[in-house]
Amino acid sequence: MFNQNGKIFDPQVKDKIVCKEIKRQAPIYEVKYEEFEGTNGSRESYASFRPFELVLTFDIFYKNEYDKELIVSELHQIFIPGFQYYVTHELSPGKRFRVNPVNFELTEEENDYSTIEITFDVPSACSESLSTTLSEFNLSNEWQFSQNLEAADYKYSFDVSRFQVFNAGDFAIDPREHALKITLQGESLGNGTIFNRTTGDRFIYYPEFSTNLGQTVTLDRVYPKLNGVHCGINTNLELITLAPGINEIEIQNVANVKSTWDFRYLYK
């Protein structure tokens, strides 16, 4: 399935365009080292996961050369729209890949069919869960085995001040790079605080706010908002990140507190 700017569709057409193989490159872990005179070996200075490739192979069937040309032209329009988009495939139905097409090649050509190989770069170096944490958790098409989901009742809406937020992905969620939306409601006389004890991150909203008066504080990626209006000047300008696994969260200086945590898991 393809998701191009919200338009979701299957590029396959029965007896005409058929995906016959999906190959995903293994994670690429790049490590750089520094060497110091007089010491043994090298010291790791930098390490990161690098972009990898996703390759889809299609068979196309046609009646003649004119029919073939029409199909190939149509596939050019589909696969190379000129912007990044998401690909989901049946081998990992609970994950999606944000891709850029980099190669479109006819690898085999016959009188009535051809084989086309399309290579995509995955620049983020990760896949992400098809659904966000505020969707229901069950092993349907949106969630699958191998997504680090245990037999547990995962919650991402809370009405207590101390709780755990579980990040089932392989990577930390950093709002400077990834979508993370936190909403905070309740009654505060000032200095309402979100504290992640696991990472040490602390976000503070200094003024009073009251949900009884219709006010909600939101952290939408890197943007603090009060009822949708940017309010970063009234904060400590810090962010909340989520480490892989369990994050111990504490909400301070807010009575009758309610909070929600919406994000996607990220996988190697």
For the regions a protein language model found, what residue spans apply to each?
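"Short basic amphipathic alpha-helical interaction patches in structured regions
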Residues: 69-76, 115-117, 132-137
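Solvent-exposed edge beta-strands and adjacent loop segments
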Residues: 1-51, 93-105
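Mixed-charge, glycine-accented linear interaction segment located at domain edges/termini
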Residues: 2-4, 121-126, 134-142
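Short, acidic/charged, Gly/Pro-enriched secondary-structure junctions
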Residues: 8, 63-103
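Intrinsically disordered, low-complexity segments enriched in serine, threonine, and glycine
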Residues: 135-268
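Oligomerization/assembly interface segments of phage tail-like spikes and tubes
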Residues: 41-66, 112-126, 247
